[in-house]
């Protein structure tokens, strides 16, 4: 491609993305959509600048206004999560995890975390952040029927293995984890409890999940762009006694510049969360439960029917055990994409971790649909679209036509001071 053509190619490709997303039902559990003011804040001069160090104590000059922004992000984060100390400089949830691993453990120390098929994130294991720090990870004992940690076995394992870190949270996360139940055992062996809240920070902010910092976690970390509808980035929340230790491990430890334009957008998203977060989080959970029920009634094997399917934004389908479905999870994910339903295949507890490209499950998330104004009745419509493809074997092109018309009706941002067109392309020239 001629260099002079790249600019137009990128614009045209971005427009295609915007227009495609307008016509899709988006059920990826790790994504969300920001308000127009958040996007405007990201497209500012802050994207060009550096600000190494903490606010009001930078190594660079020219940081007066980013200090104002970052201080506001810190203030809002501490307020929303009732935390004594917040650091918003991690550039992702994985970087936030890595900072805590560096702050609280040394190479060779043991970490207890969720196994990946049970819902743990790759950053909790040797292949990612835990391995970078040289930690030896062992898996929480897991009850697959309950889709949660086995409390009695967990306590016994903490006492026997004496880990340096006990980590909760994950990426397959339908129910709160037993943080309180680990406290006594962790204290006895000198372990620190940390909580990876990347997927559920927005629900925690809205008071609709659990409250890890009050339940015994010394650290809560996560990304700021899943159920928390902010810009891509990370945050670490902890007690005041840990402030210097974690700040030093973030910078100069694992972050240099921290993408200042994203902090400008994050400040607005946090303000939206403070104002609208409770109503939003309540509807996210209602929608997830409704989607699980609607799919279950149509013949899908939705995990944990006996527990109301979920208490978070996530709904988990076991495709292999759905007798009325003849396709694999991998095949279905592709078929749904062809029909403009965007979701992901996912490992389940009985899958081998090496089989991640052909697992038995599908993971759904209700958070982005909720931000676009959908409620329980729309979850029923989505379940019917999915049934028409997965169970009825209806022509995908025909179902797609109906999905496009449905999706176009939900393209306004809700739970914001200024909503606007969710898929508007911000054009500067």
From Swiss-Prot:
(6S)-5,6,7,8-tetrahydrofolate binds at residues 120-122. This is Serine hydroxymethyltransferase. One of its GO terms (biological process) is tetrahydrofolate interconversion. Homodimer. Its main location: cytoplasm. GO terms for molecular function: glycine hydroxymethyltransferase activity; pyridoxal phosphate binding. The keyword Protein transport does not apply. Keywords: Amino-acid biosynthesis, Cytoplasm, One-carbon metabolism, Pyridoxal phosphate, Transferase. Pathway: Amino-acid biosynthesis; glycine biosynthesis; glycine from L-serine: step 1/1.
